[in-house]
Structures are given as C-alpha cells and as structure tokens.
C-alpha cells in the first residue's frame, strides 16, 4: 500500500494502489512521521532536476548519525546524507554525478566523498 504525502509533509491516511500513483513518484521509508515531514519540507528547496532523479529515501541511522538517510537515485547511485543537512548537501550531487564513472555511493555523512557501489 502507498500513502500519498503532501508538500507540507502530512501523510494522507487513505492508501492508494500502485496503479493510481503518478508516472513519477518518490518512495519514502520513514517510521518517524516528524522525520518524514522534515525531509519533505527540505526537499522543497532542492532543484527539480535532482528531485526527478530520486527513486527511494530510507531512514538508515548509523552509530555516528541518527538521522542518516540513504537516497537511491534512478541511475543506481546511492547518496548517504543526514536529514539535518539534506537542503545544504544534496545540491552538490549535480556537480558530483558527472565525475562518477560507475554506480557509486556518494557519502555526505561527514564531508563528501564517493566510492564504488559493490
């Protein structure tokens, strides 16, 4: 089941079928509704180019970063970025992407670097 999320970050309680989803959509996997809302609000400041390339967003906390997200892009690349820094760091993906020669993980948890996605 899919639950639509408004641009305000509010989740609609009525589920929709996959066949009812728009042509392009982002799958969001958050158990914490406050984090979901914060992500959606930060997403509003991200370019349409980057937004159109996002496939899924998952909350994947690490020992060092409780609010770490894993963002899977339509090209297969993955971006690791703290929720608190999405608006600040995610725009750098447009500059990094052309430099990637293979499917990669772009780690924005502390600084920004990339490595091959194994």
Model-derived regions: residue spans:
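Short linear motifs in intrinsically disordered
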Residues: 1, 55-63, 98
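Extracytoplasmic segments of membrane-associated envelope/inner-membrane machinery
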Residues: 1-56
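Short polybasic amphipathic segments
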Residues: 2-4, 69-72
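Short hydrophobic/aromatic-rich motifs at helix boundaries and adjacent loops
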Residues: 11-15, 62-67
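Envelope-exposed proteins and targeting segments
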Residues: 24, 53-55, 65-69, 75-77, ...
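Flexible glycine-/small-residue-rich
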Residues: 30, 61, 71-75, 83, ...
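Alpha-helix N-cap/helix-start and coil->helix boundary motif
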Residues: 33, 64, 86-90
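Extracytoplasmic/luminal low-complexity segments enriched in Pro/Gly and acidic/polar residues
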Residues: 77-118
């Amino acid at each position: 089941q899919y639950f639509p999320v408004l641009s305000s970050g509010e989740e609609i309680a009525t589920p929709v079928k996959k066949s009812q989803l728009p042509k392009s959509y982002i799958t969001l996997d958050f158990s914490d509704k406050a984090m979901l809302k914060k992500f959606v609000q930060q997403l509003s400041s991200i370019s349409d180019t980057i937004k159109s390339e996002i496939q899924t967003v998952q909350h994947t906390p690490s020992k060092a970063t409780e609010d770490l997200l894993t963002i899977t892009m339509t090209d297969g690349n993955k971006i690791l970025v703290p929720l608190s820094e999405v608006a600040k760091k995610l725009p750098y993906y447009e500059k990094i992407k052309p430099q990637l020669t293979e499917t990669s993980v772009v780690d924005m948890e502390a600084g920004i670097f990339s490595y091959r996605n194994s």
